[in-house]
Structure formats: C-alpha cells, structure tokens
Amino acid sequence: SRQWLFSTNHKDIGTLYFIFGAWAGMVGTSLSILIRAELGHPGALIGDDQIYNVIVTAHAFIMIFFMVMPIMIGGFGNWLVPLMLGAPDMAFPRMNNMSFWLLPPALSLLLVSSMVENGAGTGWTVYPPLSSGIAHGGASVDLAIFSLHLAGISSILGAVNFITTVINMRSTGITLDRMPLFVWSVVITALLLLLSLPVLAGAITMLLTDRNLNTSFFDPAGGGDPILYQHLFWFFGHPEVYILILPGFGMISHIISQESGKKETFGSLGMIYAMLAIGLLGFIVWAHHMFTVGMDVDTRAYFTSATMIIAVPTGIKIFSWLATLHGTQLSYSPAILWALGFVFLFTVGGLTGVVLANSSVDIILHDTYYVVAHFHYVLSMGAVFAIMAGFIHWYPLFTGLTLNNKWLKSQFIIMFIGVNLTFFPQHFLGLAGMPRRYSDYPDAYTTWNVVSTIGSTISLLGILFFFYIIWESLVSQRQVIYPIQLNSSIEWYQNTPPAEHSYSELPLLTN
C-alpha cells in the first residue's frame, strides 16, 4: 500500500528495516547452517568447493550488509534517534525512504550473483586475482559488486541523514554532552560510514574496470598491484566492523542503565569520548588484516601497537558498564540477560582480538579458525546479542505489546548455549592449524567440528523459538498499560506505540 511504499515516517521506515533485516537474517542463517552441515563430518556434503565458497561469501555479505546494518542503523536508528532527540522525524524523510528501498534490489543482485555462472566464490573480501576476470569469469562477481554499490549508496545516504538530524534537530536542552548514548553511537557510526564506504566504492569500481574494461589497477602485468586492493578494502573493512558494533554499544548502555534503575550510565561523558576514540582509531589499524603479505618490521610494530590501543577505550566501556551495574539488585529480565551476555562474550571476543593483534602470532593464526572464532564472538555474540537485547527492551515501545518473559528467558539460554558451543571449539581448531574457507579437513579436526555443528543446530532452534515468541505476542495482543521503566530516556514518555507524529509540538527539556 502507499503508506509503506512511499512512507516518509521514521517509524514506518524503521519497521520496514526490521522486517527486511529479519528476512535477510533467515537467509544468512540458512547459509551458515549449510556451512556447518558441510563441516559436520569429514568428507564432502556439497561436493563442490566453488559452491561452498559461494555460500561462505554470501553468508558474510548477507549478515553484514543486509542483517546487522539494516537492523541496528536502519531499524533501531530510525525508530529511536528522532524519539530520543525530541525531533518530529529525520532531517530528510524521503531520502530515508530511498535508503531503505535501495536494499531489496541490492539483496536481489547478491542472490542473483549466486545463481548465474559459477557464483562469486571469492570470500567477502573479494581479493584479486581470485576475483579477476580470469579466475572468476562470468557475471557473478560483477553482480556482487553492483549489489555492494547499492548497499553502499543506501548507507551513505542514511549516514548523511543521521548526521544532519543530530546536528540540526535536537530539542532545546539536549546539548551534545546530554545527548543519549545511543544517539551518539549512531552519529559516530554514520561518520565512519561516510568516510569509509567511498573507499570501498573506489576499490570495487577499480575491480569492475579491471574485469571488464581492461584496466590493470590490481594486475601486475599492467603495472598494478593486488596489495593496493587489500589496502583499499581494509581501509573500509576495519571501520566497518566498528560500524557493526558501535550502535550495539549504544543500546547496551541504555539497557544496562535502565535495568539497573540508574539515571544514567556510569561515566557517560567518558563513554562518549571512548566511542569517538574507537571511531578514530578504527581508521588507522587496517593493515593488521594484512600481516601475512610481507610488511616491514616497523610497519608491523606500528599496526600491532595501534590495534592494541583500541583495547583501552573499549575497556573503558566494559568497566563503565560494570560500574553502572554495581550495587544494583538486578531483576533478571530477558533484556538484561542479553546485555550481560553481551558484556561477557564481547570481552572474550575482544581478548582474542588482542591476541591476534600481535603480528608475529597473527602470522601463525591468520586464515585459521581462530580468526573465525574471534570475529564471531564479537559479531554473533556481540552485535547479535545487542540486537536481541535492544529488540526485547524496546519492543513494548514499538508495538504497545508485551512478549512472554518466561519463554524469552528459555530462548536466551538455548541461544547462549548454541552460539558458545558453535564458536568456542573453533579457537581449538584454529590453534591446531585448521584453515578457513575449506569445505573439508583432515580427520584429526573431526571432534571439535562435530561439536561446532551441533551448536549451530541448537542456535537455529533458538532463533526459530524467538520468531515463535514474536508471533505469539502479535496474535495475543497483550497491551502495555504503562511502561515499567524509570524513564531515564525520553522515548519512554511516548504512548506505546507512539503516535504517528510523535512530537507535534517541540518539547523543551530541562535538567
């Protein structure tokens, strides 16, 4: 209907992002189950390494560009930023709509790329010469590049929109130092997107012309260098991983302070500076993904040290969350369970990151399952746990309905066991030298791979249970009578769900 297709309402567009992200998440999860099924026993299941690599590549692209980013930035960002700023809507409401509607064509292009020719079996990094016209002939990689172009344009437009909204549309009284941490996290994320995505666009456009127009940016035969591609890609790719986690940081800050019954997060100004520091440092560490290409020892020393420095502002955030929790009598609501799970598991993932920051160690562990375990701890148990926490926490605000808390707690336990069983053994596999992006392995690696695959099945059950819980809530229609929160953030002063136009008169906020 016209309301959805041509919407200029931040709430409706946010809801579209949630639905799109959930759908893409199911596709991405299905691909991950295929990966674990293939690795669940020695020997072949799919029987074709190209198809296996296409599945791995698509799993990464879908989870990053079509699940985490649309839900965190598009879903939570659109819904909450205007409400938390006391703004009537986003600064550019029609551009907001366009940002969303660029995503379904982008996802379609990605899915089509896997259905024509041989698919793009390059890994999400799309390194040449494997992604060149010789090793990957046909249209698949080109379609994947176009998909990334559209998703990138969508994100850049969204970033401009969020930055403008935050600069221009804050209510009187919301000074920058008093702006909610989630809004801060989104605006920092938007800045990172704005600065990093054009570099990715440049890299993949150069790859496109290398493949189709006979240029040789990345071809040594014509004076090019494949390492240039790696530098360009990772100059985008490292900020990207912070883009995936920063909005999660913002949500976790809100959830922990509200569930602790505190007025604000401990050290909220320090939290802002920490996020700014993470955003800045994220741009000057990219070559730690390239320790194995052969860099000078002093270059490696720099990237090792700079990478470890990121642990400092991250540690400030972890300990501030713990300080916020300090002295509270917690009632273990589902949202706080996810938030506590986030703090613990994100810390574990961060520690393995510090291990990998050591360039000499990384040369051994690069492209092994240790790296896979590291980034799935921070993404599958960082970003995803933050999404789960945020969704459960703000669901009553978004819908005016309540979820079944007892079921949500069981679902948390199932999911917690599932993801840890899936990814913890991968540390052992990596230390034992099992390489990434292979569809088979020597028998010695069987045991932990079987454990990992069992874990992925448990996770799948947890996700299906979650969708059932949401369905049950929607059909039961248990209305929220009044929010039980201590209103530490102004979005809770809305009706549940908020009126279509939340702030007809601009609010005046005083201390």
Curated annotation (Swiss-Prot):
Annotated binding of Mg(2+), by residue: 366-367
Residues that hold O2 according to the record: 242
Main EC class the enzyme belongs to: translocase
Cross-link (1'-histidyl-3'-tyrosine (His-Tyr)), chain numbering: 238-242
Cofactor note: Binds 2 heme A groups non-covalently per subunit. Binds a copper B center.
One record GO biological process: mitochondrial electron transport, cytochrome c to oxygen
Topology term for the membrane: Multi-pass membrane protein
Domain of life: Eukaryota
Annotated compartments: Mitochondrion inner membrane
Record note on quaternary structure: Component of the cytochrome c oxidase (complex IV, CIV), a multisubunit enzyme composed of a catalytic core of 3 subunits and several supernumerary subunits. The complex exists as a monomer or a dimer and forms supercomplexes (SCs) in the inner mitochondrial membrane with ubiquinol-cytochrome c oxidoreductase (cytochrome b-c1 complex, complex III, CIII).
Names of the cofactor(s): heme; Cu cation
Function: Component of the cytochrome c oxidase, the last enzyme in the mitochondrial electron transport chain which drives oxidative phosphorylation. The respiratory chain contains 3 multisubunit complexes succinate dehydrogenase (complex II, CII), ubiquinol-cytochrome c oxidoreductase (cytochrome b-c1 complex, complex III, CIII) and cytochrome c oxidase (complex IV, CIV), that cooperate to transfer electrons derived from NADH and succinate to molecular oxygen, creating an electrochemical gradient over the inner membrane that drives transmembrane transport and the ATP synthase.
Keyword Electron transport: yes
Protein family according to the UniProt entry: Belongs to the heme-copper respiratory oxidase family.
Catalytic activity: 4 Fe(II)-[cytochrome c] + O2 + 8 H(+)(in) = 4 Fe(III)-[cytochrome c] + 2 H2O + 4 H(+)(out)
Annotated TM spans: 15-35, 54-74, 100-120, 143-163, 181-201, 232-252, 266-286, 303-323, 336-356, 378-398, 412-432, 450-470
Pathway: Energy metabolism; oxidative phosphorylation
Binding site for heme a3: 374
Species of provenance: Drosophila yakuba (Fruit fly)
One GO location term (cellular component): mitochondrial inner membrane
InterPro entries found in the cross-reference section: Cyt_c_oxase-like_su1_dom, Cyt_c_oxase-like_su1_sf, Cyt_C_Oxase_1, Cyt_c_Oxase_su1_BS, Cyt_c_oxase_su1_dom
List of residues binding Fe(II)-heme a: 59, 376
Lineage: Eukaryota, Metazoa, Ecdysozoa, Arthropoda, Hexapoda
Ligand binding (Cu cation): 238, 288-289
Record-given protein name: Cytochrome c oxidase subunit 1
EC number(s) stated in the UniProt entry for this protein: 7.1.1.9
Positions with a binding annotation for Ca(2+): 38, 43
